[in-house]
Structures are given as C-alpha cells and as structure tokens.
Amino acid sequence: SVLLKEEIKLLLQEASNLMTNPDDKRGILIEGHTDNQDPKGKIAERYPTNWELSSARAANVVNYLIFKGVMSGRLTASGYADRWPSGATWSEVRSGKVDDMVIGDKNSNPEQRTNNRRIKIIFGVK
C-alpha cells in the first residue's frame, strides 16, 4: 500500500521535528522499495508495476513531510521497486551483484517480502 499508517505518521512527525531545524540544510532522500511480487487487485489499477508503487510510496512520505513543515527543496523521492532488497548494500546494487536470482532469494518468504516493502530516509552529508 502507499497509504501511511498512523504509526508511520507518528514516526514521521518525530522525524520532521529534526528535519525542520533551520540550521540544517542537508538534502534528504526518501527511497521507496517493494518486494518482488507484482501489484495485484485495485492497487495494480493505479500502480501497474513496482516502479510506480515504490515511487508513490516515496512521494507520499515527501508530501507528508512537506505538510509537517520540512522545506520541499531539501527532499527528493526515488522509487527502487524490487531492485534493492533489504540487506543488500549500495555497492552490491551498484556493481550488479543484485540480480534477479538474488532478488528472488531475498523475497523467498513472507517475512522477507514484508521487510522489502519499506521506505528509507537518507540524510546528505553536512
């Protein structure tokens, strides 16, 4: 789903308090991720692939943070679909070591798929 659950909103509210510090000008990247299962049912009508779904997740978080007072110019949304499973490092993804076989292995049970349906918030360097 792309809808923000109440517990996520509470967490983002706390995080937004840190992100609204006027002295902090770092960029903030919001990453959306999915498992390797294609969207189904009603969600597939709006988000036919995991690329659209992961991008929409990230965009919803960005919109919520802007609503909470974070400067929009600091925020970037990016969707990764299933291409960056939980536990894979930046260098593994960038070097091509995370291929369809690895992605399948990292989505082989419900717990792994749940872990892969996530948002990451990354702060730039000061």
Regions found by a protein language model. Name each.
Residues 1-23, 33-126:
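Periplasmic OmpA-like peptidoglycan-binding domain that tethers envelope proteins to the cell wall
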